[in-house]
């Protein structure tokens, strides 16, 4: 079985809690939540995550801004938790025509693994998360 740390970054409390509970139900070792990009970056520099589920549209700092900040942090040798960045699964309610998948993926091609559109298929998302967890 694969296990690891997962960070769910979603500003909607209900969606964030639902995702956390669903992933915990899949027996993942640790699932944390963050309400916005600022909180997420703080957590990422203090703990190593295998997977980050990242909403695009959030207050304070968007998911795109989080990706840009992660790229900058990865080049900082003093931040050890980012030397092996998490696999990022982006979630968004934006229409594909307004925010194409490749536009998101190009921002951080080493990290963004997949883009999911809301409403989410939770089982599909959980299965995808599991593929990026260490064995």
Kindly give the residue locations of the regions a language model identified.
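Alpha4 helix (beta4-alpha4-beta5 surface) of REC/receiver domains from two-component response regulators
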Residues: 65, 85-86, 95-115, 123, ...
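Conserved acidic carboxylate
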Residues: 10
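Receiver (REC) domain active-site loop signature in two-component systems and cognate sites
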Residues: 58
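Active-site residues of response regulator receiver
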Residues: 55
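Acidic catalytic/metal-coordinating carboxylates
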Residues: 36-39, 62-68
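Two-component/phosphorelay signaling modules centered on CheY-like receiver
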Residues: 13-32
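A Lys-centered signature of the CheY-like receiver
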Residues: 118
